[in-house]
Amino acid sequence: MAPRSTYDIITEIAKRRGFYWPSFEIYGGMSGFVTYGDLGTKLKRNIEALWKEHFVRKQGFLELEAPVINPERVFQASGHLENFKEYSTECQQCGESFRADTLIEEKTGMENVEAMGGERIKSLLVEQKIRCPRCGGELMEPTMILTMFKTEIGATGGEVGYARPETAQSMFLNYRRGFLHAREKVPFALAQSSKVMRNEISPRRGMLRLREFTIMELELFFDPEDPKCPWFENVSNEKI
């Protein structure tokens, strides 16, 4: 038997001590979703509070809480419908789907395969003789798949909507409101700590790949012709 990895050991301890566990366990579970237990919930809340204290309250930045579901036109304008995609491959034998770049990285140890482009990803699957990790079957040629949750807004299907995969759109959509609230002065920032959803092809990495999670994001707006920052002197001597 292969030795257990440190990640597997820590994950098991976290589940046993009530930090988190797989969601929907009594119905067989579903990959990509977790439920935070008592300790996990408290830890998560503490992290969020520290983030808000350091990045938001101390700087006098503004907070938002915007809807998770957005109309389709928002993501058409942002380019998400065209670009928020990943290469998916399917097993010809068992029908299981996988991220093509992830399979290549796991087999070869290569990094950032996604950035290599579709043709290189397709050729690597063949060159490396990569097969289905579940049953050993042959894999189909990968295709681009949109990894956003699609829904209908309105009980009778009035308008197409999507669950946001990140919170940045909310800050840009509400820039004018934030600018007015900031007394029409820059720089100012909008911050948000909220749920997002990503319809991952094959979330097989525990907490590292989830279909629903909380993201903490901040957008700083400034005048490009006068990009001075009143907080720069606080960190000007820091080495990166």
Predicted regions and their residues:
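TRNA-recognition modules of translation machinery and tRNA-sensing kinases, especially anticodon-binding
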Residues: 2-240
